[in-house]
């Protein structure tokens, strides 16, 4: 039986420095399994930095120093682990759609081919399953050989989600995945997240408080590198404990 209330990640006294600049300050945050957790706050508050800690994307930035504990299923993410495998388990969808310059089919199959999977029946099955999972199959099933760039922006973003799903991750990180999309495409992505959380843990960075309220189960509010407050989303927006949270969700600053 699936244990919905277990935490996928536990973050304890996490600090991150870019050189001498401290971007995250003693962050303590549980991220529950198979729920949507939204990270909100004004620009530069540290929410995207924390998101990138979860799959060690910050390792790619020169001069980054991290201390504290970040565990996934009880295993130290910054311990002696295979980072490539971590990034398969913890997939990422970026702010702007970034399909590869190849066909729709090959975008989804790319990661599988990179792992040495060549069986066409296996590839066909995973491509269809992943596109269905991203609510895109019915729109593209008759043109899988078409170039990915022929898709609309919203379709391209769902293709990127399908590409992530194909690798069978446990977690999907989303860094403002709808900020470049129109309202109709945004609604499709939001509806998709509701269905995806049945199988995946989702952590999303969003500048839209309305979006956080619509889609997330838990919300964490960041300000100047600090985690000010985290709670059930309804509770955080309707009855915040901290005056800074109240000011932000009321639109007093942002």
Swiss-Prot record:
State the superkingdom: Bacteria
Answer whether the UniProt record assigns the keyword Membrane to this protein: yes
Q: Which reaction does it catalyse?
A: phosphate(out) + ATP + H2O = ADP + 2 phosphate(in) + H(+)
**Mind naming one GO cellular-component term on file for this protein?**
plasma membrane
Predominant subcellular localization, coarse grouping: membrane
Q: What binding partners and quaternary form does the record give?
A: The complex is composed of two ATP-binding proteins (PstB), two transmembrane proteins (PstC and PstA) and a solute-binding protein (PstS).
What protein name applies here?
Phosphate import ATP-binding protein PstB 2
Task: Look up and give the organism this protein is from.
Answer: Photobacterium profundum (strain SS9)
Q: What is the lineage of its organism?
A: Bacteria, Pseudomonadati, Pseudomonadota, Gammaproteobacteria, Vibrionales
């Amino acid at each position: 039986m699936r244990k919905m209330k277990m935490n996928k990640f536990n973050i304890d006294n996490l600090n991150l420095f870019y050189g001498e600049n401290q971007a995250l300050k003693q962050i303590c945050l549980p991220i529950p399994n198979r729920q949507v957790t939204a990270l909100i706050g004004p620009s530069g508050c540290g929410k995207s930095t924390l998101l990138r800690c979860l799959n060690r994307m910050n390792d790619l930035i020169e001069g980054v120093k991290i201390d504290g504990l970040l565990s996934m299923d009880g295993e130290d993410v910054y311990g002696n682990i295979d980072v490539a495998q971590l990034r398969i388990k913890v997939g990422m969808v970026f702010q702007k759609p970034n399909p590869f310059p190849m066909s729709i089919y090959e975008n989804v199959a790319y990661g599988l081919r990179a792992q040495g999977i060549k069986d066409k029946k296996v590839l066909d099955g995973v491509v269809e399953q992943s596109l269905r999972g991203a609510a895109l199959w019915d729109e593209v099933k008759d043109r899988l050989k078409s170039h990915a760039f022929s898709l609309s922006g919203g379709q391209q973003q769902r293709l990127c989600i399908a590409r992530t799903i194909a690798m069978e991750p446990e977690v999907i990180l989303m860094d403002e995945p709808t900020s470049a999309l129109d309202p109709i495409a945004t609604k499709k992505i939001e509806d998709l997240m509701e269905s995806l959380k049945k199988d995946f843990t989702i952590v999303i960075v969003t500048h839209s408080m309305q979006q956080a309220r619509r889609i997330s189960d838990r919300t964490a509010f960041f300000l100047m590198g600090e985690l000010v407050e985290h709670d059930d989303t309804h509770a955080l927006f309707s009855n915040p404990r901290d005056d800074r949270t109240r000011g932000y969700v009321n639109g007093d600053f942002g």
